[in-house]
């Protein structure tokens, strides 16, 4: 299935993230929870 936009933004490779995005550090887009 498709990811929600804010979940998709979590990872740089556009992989499906969890339900929460870790907004810590400079690479927040790569930090998924």
Swiss-Prot record:
Site-annotated residues for Important for stimulation of [3H]ryanodine binding to RYR1: 6, 11, 30
GO cellular component term, pick one: extracellular region
Residues in coiled coil: none
Effect of residue 4 to A: 1.93-fold decrease of stimulation of [3H]ryanodine binding to RYR1
Keyword Membrane belongs to the record: no
Consequence recorded when altering residue 7 to A: 97.51-fold decrease of stimulation of [3H]ryanodine binding to RYR1
Superkingdom of origin: Eukaryota
Site entry: Essential for stimulation of [3H]ryanodine binding to RYR1: 7, 31, 33
Positions of region (Important for stimulation of [3H]ryanodine binding to RYR1): 8-9, 19-20, 25-27
GO molecular function: calcium channel inhibitor activity; toxin activity
Tissue spec. comment: Expressed by the venom gland.
Family: Belongs to the scorpion calcin family.
Domain comment, as recorded: The presence of a 'disulfide through disulfide knot' structurally defines this protein as a knottin.
Protein name: Imperacalcin
Organism field: Pandinus imperator
């Amino acid at each position: 299935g498709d990811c929600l936009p804010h979940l998709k933004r979590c990872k740089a490779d556009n992989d499906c993230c969890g339900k929460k995005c870790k907004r810590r550090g400079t690479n927040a887009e790569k930090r998924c929870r």
